[in-house]
A protein has these predicted regions:
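Charged docking surfaces used in two-component/phosphorelay signaling
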Residues: 15-23
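Receiver (REC) domain active-site loop signature in two-component systems and cognate sites
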Residues: 53-55
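Residue-level signal for the "D+5" position in two-component response regulator receiver
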Residues: 30, 57-58, 84, 92
Length: 125
């Protein structure tokens, strides 16, 4: 199964997402800000990233831009920012999908599976 990095400054959200994904057999890495996420990506074999936008130190948008400079992995933004402009910005900076909070955990799991399926099919994984 795939390795997934979940990055959000809300530890409860990270834990909840981790529980759902672990039940599906995924291995979870955790980060609580954008810099931490970049460090995990540089040191661990991660297949997909779920990242929040509004975080301290390095927000999800700037983190996604930096990550895209060196890593083609699928990125799903998970954010309370639900305006169309926010979604468009997230996708334009390199995210592959955008899910708004509050979210349905089962939908998030389905989107993770979909992104991993596409990524694997394209031969990048």
């Amino acid at each position: 199964m795939a390795n997934i990095l979940v990055c959000d400054d809300d530890k409860d959200i990270v834990e909840a997402i981790s529980i759902y994904l672990e039940q599906e057999g995924y291995t979870i890495f955790k980060a609580y800000d954008g810099m931490e996420a970049i460090n995990v990506l540089r040191s661990q074999p991660v297949d997909l990233l779920i990242i929040d936008i509004m975080m301290p130190k390095l927000d999800g948008i700037r983190a996604t831009l930096k990550i895209r400079e060196e890593n083609p992995l699928p990125i799903i933004i998970l954010s309370a920012k639900s305006e169309d402009a926010d979604k468009i910005l997230g996708l334009n900076v390199g995210a592959d999908d955008y899910v708004t909070k509050p979210f349905n955990p089962l939908e998030l799991v389905a989107r993770v599976k979909s992104q991993l399926r596409r990524y694997t099919r394209l031969g990048a994984a």
